[in-house]
Amino acid sequence: MFDQTAWGWLPSLYLLLGGLAGGLTLVSSIVRLCSGGMSNETCGPRSLGSFPATSSCIALAALAVGLACLVSELDNPDQALAMHLSFSNAGSWMTYGAWTLVAGCVVFAANAVLATPRTRAALLALFPHVGSRTIVIAGNAAMAAAGIVGLAIAAYTGMLLRSAGSIPMWDTPLLPVLFTLSSCSMGAEVAALLLCWGGEAAKGTRQKTSLQSAVTAYRAVSIGAMAIALLEAGVLMAYMVGRTSASPLGADMTRSLVEGELAPWFWVGAVALGIVVPLACEAVATCSPQGTGMGGPSLRGALSAAQPGTRAAKTVARPIAAIVAAACSVVGSFALRCIVVAVGVHEPLTAAQLVAASLGIS
């Protein structure tokens, strides 16, 4: 039944990397916007430590590796350049995607440069006449643009499959929605982990304030991740129900996911690792009274214990729950894309369609 499918694991990988890049950039931009963007005084992010720079660089690297995987599958890599130079099929989703990915590379790179303290300092040293205020404006503009392009890339990974046509499991508007939510879920879990590991407190008397800002951002992202996971579960259920009633082939493919050869990938990978475990980890990490999480202190616990000059106040805690949630979310999202690609089987042609095709009749 699945012999029609020529795609292996590599397409699922670059769909995953594109979704991770888009989702992480979108979540990071929202967090930075809610935290005040870049400050005029320091020409840097406010109270978020290394999170803006780290998240921007990870998103850029994920997009670059995903593009490399995509180009590696082309028989002639020059075809990738031809997509941008030819406007003969400008209305296709492939062309839209090609330009969106190029825009993503440019905007993500600018965002990473302007979010990293050393590169900002280098820019000011090279162009002293520009001034810190201009860098702040450019950084906030790049942050906003990166968030918009990130959302477009996350949605495009689903639109690319839907545009194939005549494939029951892909021919639904719920697929782009599902992939977008999956990408945002990944981005939120990775962002929560980065806030734990990279949210260092400011020095001196401002240390407590910076810890409070990091705790607030972490808690907001964790709650957002739980909400996105619940939405993803609902859309996944609607997708499965809708594909069951779409056609006999759609019903067969859905059955293969629920109780057939792809069932372990679906239940263990997409559902358990992709949704249930991250949801449980975030619930434990955010609802625990002392913030003990799963084997380690949370940011809330670190805040209550931190005092200026103490070791606890020098770094934000690193709960194991955030590590488990981020890892499971990425693995589960990869499993989701693998099974969606695997069930991408064309409807069999009828005799009338074969005759029409042989006569060149559309």
What function would you assign to each model-found segment?
Residues D3-A6, L16-L20:
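Short, extreme N-terminal leader segments that mark the start of a protein/domain
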Residues G8-W9, C43-L60, M94-W99, R133-A144, ...:
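Alpha-helical transmembrane segments and their helix-start/interface "positive-inside/aromatic belt" motifs
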Residues L15-L17, C34, S39-N40, V102, ...:
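Long, contiguous internal "core" modules enriched in hydrophobic/ aromatic residues
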Residues L20, L24-V107:
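Membrane helical hairpin/interfacial module
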Residues V324-V343:
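Final/C-terminal transmembrane alpha-helix of multipass membrane proteins
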Residues M1-P11, N40-R46, L74-T95, T157-L178, ...:
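Membrane-interface interhelical loops and short amphipathic "cap" helices
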